[in-house]
Design a protein with these regions (language model features):
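Catalytic domains of cell-wall/extracellular-matrix polysaccharide-remodeling enzymes
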Residues: 189-247, 316-339, 343
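Active-site-proximal, well-structured secondary-structure segments within enzyme catalytic domains
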Residues: 84-137, 147-182
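Positively charged, amphipathic and often flexible ligand-engagement surfaces
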Residues: 162-165, 174-186, 191, 238-240, ...
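Aromatic- and glycine-enriched glycan-recognition loops and surfaces
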Residues: 27-38, 131-140, 180-198
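CE4/NodB-like, metal-dependent polysaccharide N-deacetylase domain
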Residues: 175-212, 294-311
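Active-site and substrate-binding clefts of carbohydrate-active enzymes
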Residues: 1-118, 248-369
Length: 369
């Protein structure tokens, strides 16, 4: 059985359109703490994965790298401790509650910007310098992983819109639809094309793969994505079961389908959600063994030439795990790599060997429904 892990990286635009100042620090925070960590762990374990970068996130990362982005949190970290204002102390106190000494508060807050199991011991100024180094090397580090065969890079429509609703809001189920029609396929097509082109400008190649925001797909979206140059997209198994006539066979999940000339992979919802929302409550070893047992059960049900796809947020879950998820991910990567009967793969690589053949009459949907 082939196995693909897809890690989704997304932050919306936090830049004020008038002042150009960053209102919230989350691009800064996740880039240094989590995107860097995911690249480090993949390289350390030589563990192949797929990483999905939203274009508007890339835009903001590059502004931080170039020094044109600043946010109140970063400004408070860089101030002389004696010049911290009450507002600065309150802001840093949200990261490090209970600390009243200004210098100590800054030191603890800047340490919180990093994944502690992967960070060398340095003082505040040393960590601020390290932050700049990490940001500057962030995107190149993923290109290096790609060159080593350890990373497939994919993207999303530019500003992370839910495409079926942009193409036609009437594609949504339910009674709570706006009275006025909303149908702007031209905007959806523009965001697909703009996102793919911007990704290509930054990384030097245009991506084959697409994670449509929230896994939002429809026949119209699939047609537009294919026309924009994407060869495959990913969504949730919920969409597969809505689109396939009953009875549903579990093995149907473990292969790609064709919709409007676009290959579609459907993620395993249970396994993706266990990593996102459940395993942080478990001891790492027990969580990994439970995950492996579920993988083995799926392999037995899937048959030959099958692929199991796991897609989840690659940034937010880890703060709820001990050690920012590092001990768990190390254990998971090590155990999965040693599993017999599984091959870690890229989605494009799988399609090259096993092209999608079965057509699917795609029903509009997202991972939510």
């Amino acid at each position: 059985m082939h196995l693909a892990f897809v890690w989704h990286f997304h932050q919306p635009i936090y830049r004020d359109p008038d002042t150009r100042e960053y209102i919230l620090p989350w691009v800064n925070y996740h880039a240094v703490k989590n995107y860097h960590q995911m690249a480090r762990l993949a390289e350390e374990a030589e563990f192949p994965g797929t990483y999905n970068f939203v274009p508007c996130l890339l835009e903001q990362v590059l502004e931080y790298v170039g020094g044109s982005a600043n946010d109140p949190f970063q400004a408070a970290l860089e101030k002389d401790p004696g010049k911290l204002t009450y507002a600065d102390v309150r802001l840093l106190g949200k990261i490090v509650p209970g600390e009243t000494n200004a210098r100590r508060l800054q030191e603890l807050a800047v340490k919180a910007l990093f994944s502690s199991p992967l960070t060398p011991e340095r003082d505040r100024d040393g960590l601020l310098d390290l932050r700049k180094e990490v940001l500057a090397d962030l995107l190149p580090s993923y290109l290096r992983l790609r060159q080593k065969g350890l990373a497939e890079l994919t993207t999303t429509p530019y500003y992370h819109p839910i495409l079926p609703l942009v193409f036609d809001v009437r594609s949504a189920d339910g009674d709570s639809l706006p009275e006025l029609p909303f149908r702007h396929p031209e905007d959806g097509k523009s965001q697909l094309a703009k996102g793919r082109a911007y990704f290509g400008k930054i990384f030097g190649f245009e991506p084959a793969g697409l994670w449509p925001s929230e896994g939002g797909v429809s026949r119209e979206v699939a047609r537009a994505a294919s026309a924009a140059g994407f060869r495959f997209a990913l969504t949730d198994e919920n969409v597969l079961w809505k689109s396939r006539p009953a009875p549903h066979v579990p093995a149907d999940l473990f292969k790609p389908y064709l919709a409007e000339s676009l290959a579609l992979f459907f993620r395993d919802r249970e396994l993706s959600d266990l990593l996102s929302f459940e395993y942080q409550k478990w001891p790492a070893a027990a969580a990994v063994e439970d995950f492996v047992a579920k993988l083995e059960a799926r392999r037995k049900a899937a048959g030959e030439a099958s692929i199991l796809v796991i897609v989840l947020d690659g940034e937010n879950p880890w703060e709820y795990y001990p050690g920012n998820g590092v001990p768990f991910l190390r254990a998971l990567y090590d155990r999965v790599k040693r599993l017999e009967g599984f091959t870690l793969t890229s989605l494009a690589g799988y399609l090259a060997a096993e092209p999608a053949r079965d057509e699917i009459d795609l029903v509009p949907g997202t991972w939510l429904g």
